[in-house]
Amino acid sequence: MYKRQLKSYNGSFDDGTAYYEFTQRLGYALLLKTDYAAAVQSVCCAVPGCAHDTDACPAYFPGRAGRYTVVAAGDTVYVWHISFFYDDQSWDDYWAEKLASGVRDREPFDTLTDAEFEAEYRGIWTEQSTPPCLYAVDPAAGKTRTDLPLTYRDYTMDACDGSTLYGEGVTIPYRTQVSPGRIGPTPACRIDLATGQAETFVLEPTEHYLAGFDGALLTCRYVADAPLPTDAEQYAAAIQSATVEIDRLDPRTGARTGLTERPYSNADYENNGCFIGVYNGKAYFEEREIIPGSGFRRTVLTTVDAAGRAETVWDPWPQAEWVLGDDGGRYIWLYRDNYNTSYAACALLDTETGQITPVTQALQTGSGAVSLRGKAHDGRWLVVIGADSAGRTTAYGLIDADQFAAGSTDWQPVAMWQG
């Protein structure tokens, strides 16, 4: 089972039986679990009498929640520590630097007590001074940590096949480089979850992961008649005639199958062939038309399946502001892109019939439409049904996907952790 992190913006993970996410506390993050069968959210800890506020707690992770990514594989939960900001500075030097910076007198820290302010930054320092590592979480007994060499700080962890994490080196897109030299093979890595053993390998030049796909990985790379030059100006000219090759790559064997080729586009700002996501077993791509001085408009939506069969879904794009969002299985959640400033769920696209159904269900508390967080193996969705004034989730509900698509609000409320 390959799965790219659906909610990579907050490190959460949905394995079909539960939804795992982090919640931020003062100086640390707690790992929460929403069990679909029980409809209960709880701290991922079963230690009797645990207060969940020290490192002895299996669910406790120092610093900021955004520095961690969780993945559930089998009966074990793993947490990858993202260490882009690793620093070996001593606590005394770090603390003196923060006190001298004046941050203590600025929002939101000006409302904290001295003890709270120190606790916040001690947690951040603890996280930043921790090397790249993999935690194995046992809710009943604690967590074990396997440290990796510092070179792994430069890798993102993008996919998991149930036993191994796969990542790739973080590189700035070549078009933004001042100096050349990023045209060579893309560094990649794999980490065995059971042992923590890690090794590196390389992808093709310019290649990078897009998503888990058909039991393997979907990748993207530029293909040209001649090797792309390293000079920035020559590269910018040569890339115009390149094609974007989309492949199915099995990183365990190196077997590669070409699925489709797409023409290079100056509107491909993400350098991914205008890839949107994998939905219901197919890879989705959009075509774009540049609007001089004001970005681009989406024009055509196409798919390709594991056999390389292509299909046009939309031509033209039905609503200019619509973007494809969360994967609901048969249904794709469509969101309204308010000029890249905010997103709101607006409709569901049925991948089997092509029918588009407006999302009419509103939050019970807070404003706006409900949104998807996970999907259970039994066909139910975990949806946000309540939020506070700051947009933080306060309530979840579980509901059958087809019933939701029919407009139902007959969801089963989740008993939320009251921490």
Task: Identify what each model region corresponds to.
Residues 73-75, 144-145, 161-164, 187-190, ...:
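P-loop NTPase catalytic nucleotide-binding module
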Residues 22, 34-44, 61-87, 158-168, ...:
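Hydrophobic, aliphatic-enriched repeat segments that assemble into extended interaction scaffolds
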Residues 19-22, 79-81, 166-174, 218-221, ...:
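Residue position within the beta-strands of beta-propeller blades
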Residues 4-14, 54-71, 151-163, 203-216, ...:
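Repeated scaffold domains used in trafficking and secretory/extracellular systems
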